[in-house]
Amino acid sequence: MIITSPLLDYVTSHQDIKAINQWRADVEQQLQEFYENGYSIRDIVLARSNLIDEALTFLWKHAGLDQSDLGLFAVGGYGRREMLPYSDVDIMILSENDISPEHEKQISGFISSLWDVGNFKPGTSVRSIQNCVEQATNDLTVATTLIESRLITGNPDLAKWPRRIVSQTWTDKTFFDAKMEEQAKRHAQHNNTESNLEPDIKNAPGGIRDMNQIGWIAKRHFRVNRIYDLVHLGFITEYELKVLEEAESFLWEIRHHLHLLSKRDENRLLFDHQREIAAKFGYTRAEGQPVNFAVEQFMKRYYRTAQQVSTLNEMLLAYFNESVITPRLPNYERKIEEINENFKLVDGKLAVQHHKVFSENPSAILELFYLLANHPEIEGIRARTLRLLIMAAKRIDQEFRDNPAHQALFMAIIRSPYRLYDTLVDMKRYGILGNYIPAFGQIMGLMQYDLFHIYTVDAHTLLLIRNLNRFKEPEFAQHFPVVSSVFQRLARRDIVYLAAIFHDIAKGRGGDHSELGAEDAIEFCRAHGFTERECKLVAWLIHNHLLMSLTAQKKDISDPDVIKEFAEKLGDMEHLDYLYTLTVADINATNPKLWNTWRASLMRQLYTYSRDVIRSGLGRPVDYQMLIEDTKFSASETLVNEFSLDAVEKVWQELGDEYFLKESADEIAWHTRAILQHGDNPAPIVLLRAHRQSAQDAVQIFIYTQDKPNLFATTVAVLDRMNLDVQDARIITATKAFSLDTYVVLDRFGTLLTDPEREHTVKEALIKALSQSDKYPGLMQRRIPRQLRHFDIENTVDITLNPVLQQNMVEISTLDQPGLLARVGGLFMMQGLDIHSAKIATLGERAEDIFFVTKKDGQPMTTDEAHIFSAQLKLALDEASNQIVSQH
């Protein structure tokens, strides 16, 4: 690689030192051309560092500092020769003694020239050796900087001092402990995971800093300049070096593109850039493949790379601790406890008896994890053993998987009562799980390009198992009281664990992942000794793992017919119990924001109602009249001491049977009391209370007012202005043209029922808006969140007829956006449609809402009318989505 514009010639020909700025632009252009013509990112990064060395040396001489006894050092990434297009140029000017006034003036001119002439935006420190000693003693960052410093030009006698200073001020142990604590804090800032949706490729676990960490600690002890030198010292293997170098090149290349796209030193792989960078790496989508195929494959490579780096970081630093730090501790005496012919405990961690254990006895691979799963006192795996284990993972082939002894060991791990989740995480991390179940290996690192699934598929799967395990722990029983009780009585927990492992295992293949996963599970279960009935139960759970959540989300579970239909699909309590535990664990493992007490109450209601139907007999028809009478009786029992039965009956006469079928006795009593206390006052009634099903973050709003065309649209517009998210709505019109509306809302700030002033503000805003029958409140203009602008969601509208209710069911799926429900409500109002109920769901960037509507005469739309309205509604949604895209 030859840069065609040598700096000295360039400055001479332009007769102006300020030409360095243009020279930098020219060489950057040449570097980009070299990259596009096939030069490796390592060549480009090194060339850029050398060119900056050349420029700084030129400016150093121009400032007259070449005649001084000072030294100019590159530090940070520049010291490591890791320079990307917009990387900081960090330098240190070092003096053996205090700096003279003359040199201070020259240094000032040199630093100014870096800004004014070269536009380097440098990070600069000026220190004497004594300054370095004082600062390095108390500042880990300074000590780290000194370790990777590199003399660019100046006094060669100073080159030895930076590392000598660190050796004097930090011992191996103090430096190692401090760097490990620093890494732990850094990882915590990134959720201790490699699989964030928008990862920081430099600082997150598995990023560039994790590779730097290995270098810093090794360089401090072994006094080497390159990671490559550690191979000759026996600290890392050739294979590990190859993995690190390939990972480093890949991450540098991503960072290279991030810098050029954002025109700054950017390390975050944001949604803004993921698609474009995927294309630059050659990832494309063939016809028929999912729309996000290319970006998901690129991110899969990233997550797998980050996992490799993270694992090597863990292993190599543990190896350093065990081989260098611990043996040097005062009074250290290694504690060894024999286990069997394959394993022993060394200082509380598992270690092989000899280095050929895994090659001579392959079953020891799974035996190791059996010991970990069933002996909580074991603290982990020794680093040397871990290195052998990672290499042994490659031995797991079909012959290994078909071995009955290995199958028995694997199922013994799954049935462990102690730490199944941690053990499976280790098995995944070290390559065992993905090799033993090859289909699981295919989903490792697989992300779904949306805001709903915030974990990779493999991480989500193991979190699901963690959640299932938590259902048996007392500290989580208060958060999941019903499901914990159900889980405790499951006859075979291994059935739900295997359903969890396989429920998403077919994602990314195309086709129905539930169906394909069920097929994989049956084959696996048969091979592992399950009866045919047990195999079918596991497969049924996988095939139907979305049934319960979709029923609660999209259907009216207060409708006895809905419950009966759902219960008939299950057939018995065994299927209900297994599906309930799997579903709750699944939702909680998908996205922490998805689970709230409102959703918990829906799941609990669906489970309870279905349980009652199954226990009373699936063949029994629903006795609607008996349900109505029972509900009325329970409600009247609550009201009898406050009002006469005649007064109560007078109110109830205005309400239809549907009201008493779908509202609870408690809610009916609440509504009736408010109406009777209000008397003949024409003003709307607005009441707020916590949701009856112990949904602490959900608020019920009851509205009783004269019916009018824009009632729903007006209400949701006001609620949107009040920062309240509607989850459920039920609108019932009484015979005297009064409407009884119940909304369940989630409060974005969580203060609605604890702040009397805010509660009063919400009530007054609703009363005022509902009292002005001819006015419709305008929509709030809110800033669209950045992430939403990068998702191309196809807007869909589906209108069907519910023959029982004689209502149209309008299902919409669109990009979530501020004020969406209010905007949709306005469209219904303009079309003269009455909304009777609504089910609202926000799944990441996607809104999936269902409305039950009729025309003003109470009749459903005809087929032609529904077709026309569907087209109008989709057009409006498309226009709203286009506005969001145009803001990007």
UniProtKB/Swiss-Prot annotation:
Q: Where's the HD domain?
A: 457-579
* Residue numbers spanned by region Disordered: 182-204
ACT domain location is 700-781, 809-887
Positions of the UniProt region annotated as Uridylyltransferase: 1-338
EC number, UniProt record: 2.7.7.59, 3.1.4.-
What family does the database annotate? Belongs to the GlnD family.
The entry's protein name is: Bifunctional uridylyltransferase/uridylyl-removing enzyme
Source organism per UniProt? Acinetobacter baylyi (strain ATCC 33305 / BD413 / ADP1)
Lineage of the organism:
Bacteria, Pseudomonadati, Pseudomonadota, Gammaproteobacteria, Moraxellales
Q: Please state the gene responsible for encoding this protein.
A: glnD
